[in-house]
Amino acid sequence: MDYKSLKTLEYHKIIEKLSSYAGSEAARKMCADLKPMTDINSINDALTQTSDALSRIYAKGSVSFSGVTNIIDSIKRLEVGSTLNTHELLNISAVLTTAAAAKSHYEETNDSLTDYFNSLEPLTPLNTQIKNCIISEEEISDDASGTLRDIRRQMRISADRIHTELNKILNSPSTRSCLQDYVITMRQGRYCLPVKAEYKSQIAGMIHDQSATGSTIFIEPAAVVKLNNDIRELELKEQAEIERILAALSAEASAYTDELQSDYTILVTLDFIFAKAQLSKFYKCSCPIMNTDKYINI
C-alpha cells in the first residue's frame, strides 16, 4: 500500500494508538514499523494470534510487559565474561519476573500462543539470587554474603565509636565555645566538627575543609583519626566484596545467555501481539475472514 493511501486512511494515528498499548520499547518499535501485509497466510496467522490474545485477555485479564527492558547488550557482555553492574542485573531480573508472571498467568490455555508461553524460562533460582542480593541500583543487601554483612557490622561499630568520641568533644565545656555549630559533619569522607576559624588551633586534629567565607574550619579531631582510617579501610573491603558478588551473579547469569535471549525475544513478541489485542478490544473489532478474490463484504 502506497504512502498516500496510508496518509488518507490516517494509518499513523492507528499506529500511535497501537504503540500506546505496548509495555516495552522494543515492542513499541515493532508497532511503529508495522505495515499492511499482502501474504494471506501471514495475515491469517497474525489475525489468529491477535484473536487468541484477545480471548486470553477476556478470560484472565492482561499481563504487564513493562518490565521487559532491553538486555541484549548485557547478554553480549555476559558472553565475553564481563561483570554486569546492578542496573543490568536488575534489568535481567525484571525480564525474568515478567516471564514468570506471563507463564503462570496463562497456564492451561491452548491456542496459537501456547508455544510462546511454554518456551519461556523464568530461571527462578537465578532471579531469586539477584533479588536477594540487590535491593536497588545503589544498594546491595547485607544478606548478599556473610562477609559483606560482617564488614558492614564493623563499619557501624566504628561509626558509633566515632560519634561517641565526637559527642564528648561537642559536650565538653572547654571546647563548646570553639565550635561554629554543635553538629557532626562529613568532609572528604571523614567525620569532622565545624570549628570557628579563630579557634582552629584549640582543636587538635586534621583540617579537611573550610566554609566559603573562611569563618568555619572543618577539623577531624585527633581522637577519631584512627577510627576514620578504620572505616575507610572497611569501605574499600566493602567495595571489593560488592564487586565479587556482582562478578559471581554475572558468572551465574552467563550460563543462561541462550535462555535470556529467548525470553527477551518472546516477551517482546507477546507484548506486540497483546498490544494489537488491546487495540482490537478498544475499538470492539471483529476478526475478518480473508480471501484472495478481492471480495469485500462489510
Model-derived segments and spans:
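Alpha-helical coupling/stalk and coiled-coil linker elements that connect catalytic or binding modules
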Residues: 1-62, 80-83, 111-115, 129-298
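N-terminal helix-rich structural modules
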Residues: 66, 76-81
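Short secondary-structure subsegments characteristic of cysteine-rich extracellular domains
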Residues: 84-100
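The cytoplasmic-loop to transmembrane-helix boundary for the fourth helix
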Residues: 119-123
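Phosphate/adenylate-binding glycine loop and adjacent helical scaffold
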Residues: 126
